[in-house]
Amino acid sequence: MLGAYLPILVLVVIAVLFGLGSVIFSSLIGQKKPSTVKLAPYECGCEPVGSARERFSIKFYLIAMLFILFDIEAVFLYPWAVLFKRLGMFGLIEMGVFIVILFVGYVYVWKKGALEWE
């Protein structure tokens, strides 16, 4: 049974070896002459504005965490939608409870003002 996964394992091993080999090979034969231009932060070909070590507002992290939360919701809803007929009423109730819990969390975040950008 595990033999069916052997080609995937071989592909993963080859991909990891190729990635590591590329990094090691380039570090061995590449030039190692740092300069101020090479050490400067890169901003899409434009001149850097301000410091690259500037601190981000906590709001960015909050939005990222909320995105991950609702992205996980989509990950759980997709298989449920595919297997809807096979799961029957149990699956419908189970997903209903899941969506209600997420909706309560969304309302909580909304009431706390986490979605307001000021």
Curated annotation (Swiss-Prot):
Its EC number is 7.1.1.-. Keywords: Cell inner membrane, Cell membrane, Membrane, NAD, Quinone, Translocase, Transmembrane, Transmembrane helix, Transport, Ubiquinone. Pfam families: Oxidored_q4 (PF00507). It is found in: Cell inner membrane. It is a multi-pass membrane protein. The chain crosses the membrane at residues 5-25, 62-82, 87-107. NDH-1 shuttles electrons from NADH, via FMN and iron-sulfur (Fe-S) centers, to quinones in the respiratory chain. The immediate electron acceptor for the enzyme in this species is believed to be ubiquinone. Couples the redox reaction to proton translocation (for every two electrons transferred, four hydrogen ions are translocated across the cytoplasmic membrane), and thus conserves the redox energy in a proton gradient. PANTHER family: NADH-QUINONE OXIDOREDUCTASE SUBUNIT A, NADH-UBIQUINONE OXIDOREDUCTASE CHAIN 3. This is NADH-quinone oxidoreductase subunit A 2. It comes from Citrifermentans bemidjiense (strain ATCC BAA-1014 / DSM 16622 / JCM 12645 / Bem) (Geobacter bemidjiensis). The lineage of its organism: Bacteria, Pseudomonadati, Thermodesulfobacteriota, Desulfuromonadia, Geobacterales.
